[in-house]
Swiss-Prot record:
Its main location: cytoplasm. It comes from Hyphomonas neptunium (strain ATCC 15444). GO terms for biological process: DNA recombination; DNA repair. Keywords: Cytoplasm, DNA damage, DNA recombination, DNA repair, DNA-binding, Endonuclease, Hydrolase, Magnesium, Metal-binding, Nuclease. Its cofactor is Mg(2+). One of its GO terms (molecular function) is DNA binding. One of its GO terms (cellular component) is cytoplasm. This is Crossover junction endodeoxyribonuclease RuvC. It catalyses: Endonucleolytic cleavage at a junction such as a reciprocal single-stranded crossover between two homologous DNA duplexes (Holliday junction). The lineage of its organism: Bacteria, Pseudomonadati, Pseudomonadota, Alphaproteobacteria, Hyphomonadales.
Amino acid sequence: MSTPIRILGIDPGLRHTGWGVIEQSGARLVHIAHGVIDPPTDLSMAERLGHIFEAVGELARHHAPHAAGVEETLVNANPRSALKLGQARGAAMAALAMAGVSVAEFAPRQIKLSVVGTGTADKDQVKFMVQRLLPRAGEMKLDAADALACAICAAHHLPLQMKRGAA
């Protein structure tokens, strides 16, 4: 039996940053924990980013992941929103880097394809499949489901990246 690899998935957001931790042992995936980081709404932008940075750093210290998967930011019709989302993503990635965690980035379409089988799945379909793949995870918010989906995607792709020395 192979040594389990612990993976932290992050679904970044300024209001809600989802996170999920799984372990992969061979083809088997096991749920460890999940949740949502909710910075107080009365904080300034810089304070929210600091809150995300601190919380993700604490998750990395507490769960000691071998690797992390972070969802990439898509630039949509609202570039201002995409920029803000990118800042939250940067805060999370910086916290992971400071904790010495290898980070892999995945496009939303790639995550959905890995978990649901189609890159156009909606959030409810992703949550449904995450709960099927990780039955011990129980009930969760959509942001946590997206983060667990990112961790599952990382589990599917990290072995190949580790062989290449990219992770």
